[in-house]
Amino acid sequence: HIGAVGAKLLYPDNTVQHAGIILGIGGIAQHCFIDNPRDDVGFYGRLSVPFNYSAVTAACLMVSKEKYLEVNGLEEDLQVAFNDVDFNLKLLKQGYYNICLNHVELYHHESKSRGDDTVDTSSAKYRRFVQEHDYIKDKWGYMLYTDRFYNPNLSLKKAFVLDKE
């Protein structure tokens, strides 16, 4: 029943870079617990136990070859952004669960080699990011706002908080 398996990724300063991905936050999806201290237990202990998420980052993702082939692998139209989200959603659609093993920790220098795609809005990187953003939004639509592993009463602006009315 397990699809993709991810790990807790840490920045060099021992804060969390990734411990699962929540759909809908930031428009498409966002890593949760960004900048939390390494030893923080997280919302209801999510950082201290393995936990199901709709997606885990491709920066450290394990999946069996059979399941990878079953869902036709990674989408070639998504060269950089959201290819992991798309892949994880294809696994969910097939009935698999994606899980983040938060006791497995690795250091990750996020985007160190390629930089930030959204800084220079006149760059080819930015244009590609916008195309990939639109592609994933068109393909998955409503699923991006109905994360089955995230409480619908919580905010889509920032993870694990209530919106103020």
For each predicted feature, which ranges?
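Conserved donor NDP-sugar-binding/catalytic core segment of glycosyltransferases
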Residues: 1-28, 97
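Short glycine/serine/threonine-enriched helix-capping/active-site loop
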Residues: 5-8, 101-102, 109
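Small-residue-rich loop/turn and linker elements
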Residues: 9, 113-114
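C-terminal, non-catalytic tails of nucleotide-sugar-dependent glycosyltransferases
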Residues: 13-14, 25-53, 57, 62, ...
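Histidine-centered active-site/metal-ligand motif
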Residues: 31, 108-109
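A short, conserved alpha-helix in the catalytic core of glycosyltransferases
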Residues: 45-72, 77-105
